[in-house]
Structures are given as C-alpha cells and as structure tokens.
C-alpha cells in the first residue's frame, strides 16, 4: 500500500469560529514523506501537524510556532485522516480553519473534488502494542488499545434532556465515516456561547455552524441530523486529534467524556515509551494493509 495525497489544488472560503473573520484556505498535494503541514501565508510560517506543536487544547486543538498559531484544526484533520491522506499542505491567510457547517462533511466534499493520488513510497501506520490510558478524578477517560482493526468507541453523559447518555461504536472505513460521522456538527450551550462572545470568542458561531441548546432543547429549527449527533461529533473530533500521531492508527480508541486536552495527553503518553507502539510498513504488513484496502475500497470504487 502506497502513501496518498490529493490529485490537485482545491480552494475554499469560510469564516473562523472564534474570530468570525473570513479565511481563504487551499489544499495542495505534497510528495511522499512530507506529512501534513499548515502554512500561514499572511505570516510566512509553516507548522507541521505534530504533537510537539500543540499549544492549546481548551476550546479546540491549536498548533503554533514562533508565536504564530492555527486554531480549530480538528474537523479538517478528521477528514484528512479518515481519507487516508499522508501528505498535504494546507495554506491559510488567517489563524483559524473555516468552520463551514460545524461538521467535516464539507471537507470530505473538498477532498473528493481534489481526488486521491497514490505516491511512490509505501504507507506507514502506527500500531498500538500496549494499552495506555489517561484518566481524571471526575471519571473522564481516554484509552488506546491493541487491535488489528481501527475502532473508535465513545460515551458521553450530559445532564441535559436533549443529550443524556449516548454511546457510539465506529468501525473505520471511509464510507462509514462519510455517512455516519462527517455530518455530525459541533455543539454548544446558549449560556456558554453568550459568555464566549462577551470575552471575544465564538464571534463566528451560529446555528448555521453548530447545534445550539438552551436549558431544555435544541434551538436549531432543522433539529438534529442524528438522534445521537452529539457523541458522533465527539468521534469526529477524536479522529482529528489522532492525526497528531503523524501515522494512520491501527488500534482501538475508547473514551468516556474525552476531550481535546485528554487526547493530546494520550498521544504524548503513547510516544513516551517505544514499547507502546510499532511503526509498520503497509507494503510489508499484509494483514494490516488489508484493513485499509477494505476501508478505502467502497467509496473509491
């Protein structure tokens, strides 16, 4: 199995979630072994998608270098990672990725518009060898477990009548991601949005790019795309955060009330001990390669 990039440049214009200002973004193909990189054209700074460059995880995943940051990268990275793209340059003229409709569906469409191109060098993956876990005193947990498959399990429990307790199990394939994960939107509570706006954040947030809830119900007139859209979006976010591993994951991700911050701690902990993982060549590891071949096949046939 070979590394992948996109076949041609594609452009999109949108607004950033927090500043609410317009941003132009272009996806550009890259050669083998270049990885996923962001380039801030207004600042002339390149920032690789690596855990070492994560500078903030409170409201979103933010990477930075030399005082230049790029915020809210997780939805775009989720689509890139789900489509198995290994090498890509993302050019932005501002410090936030466009929020689009609050999901990653628009990014899936953009990638499909660009097309997928196989490169010459073999694709690599990171295979989990030992279970690792991050926990908190209030019961939150994120875990990576050994598996020959690519699986995401997530559980949330909100004391809100429109959310409550939700679980979702995702067996990875591009088709399943596109149909069942990518369309799930980010969500927030009205009182939180009002507070964030009072401190200069969420300026671009609206019911056009997020699910908004008051104390009892969903305020969006169109309602939900899935009954369990909230937990599906948490999986979307987790996939985007796992892109910071730099290699495609082979293993099981399992979370209870996970977050960007816990995901970042998990990726750091994984790399602390080489016994936790193995970097495998998918030209040589036929059983693992077959998992990806099946995952890629339906949407590309």
Swiss-Prot record:
Keywords from the named record: Hydrolase, Lipid A biosynthesis, Lipid biosynthesis, Lipid metabolism, Metal-binding, Zinc
GO BP, one annotated term: lipid A biosynthetic process
Gene Ontology terms, MF aspect: metal ion binding; UDP-3-O-acyl-N-acetylglucosamine deacetylase activity
EC class of the enzyme, as a word: hydrolase
Metabolic or biological pathway, per its Swiss-Prot or TrEMBL entry: Glycolipid biosynthesis; lipid IV(A) biosynthesis; lipid IV(A) from (3R)-3-hydroxytetradecanoyl-[acyl-carrier-protein] and UDP-N-acetyl-alpha-D-glucosamine: step 2/6
Annotated EC: 3.5.1.108
Active site: 260
A Pfam family that the UniProt record links to this protein: LpxC
Annotated positions binding Zn(2+): 75, 233, 237
Catalytic activity: a UDP-3-O-[(3R)-3-hydroxyacyl]-N-acetyl-alpha-D-glucosamine + H2O = a UDP-3-O-[(3R)-3-hydroxyacyl]-alpha-D-glucosamine + acetate
Family: Belongs to the LpxC family.
NCBIfam families: lpxC (TIGR00325)
Function of the molecule: Catalyzes the hydrolysis of UDP-3-O-myristoyl-N-acetylglucosamine to form UDP-3-O-myristoylglucosamine and acetate, the committed step in lipid A biosynthesis.
PANTHER family: UDP-3-O-ACYL-N-ACETYLGLUCOSAMINE DEACETYLASE 1, MITOCHONDRIAL-RELATED
Name of the featured protein: UDP-3-O-acyl-N-acetylglucosamine deacetylase
Organism: Aliarcobacter butzleri (strain RM4018) (Arcobacter butzleri)
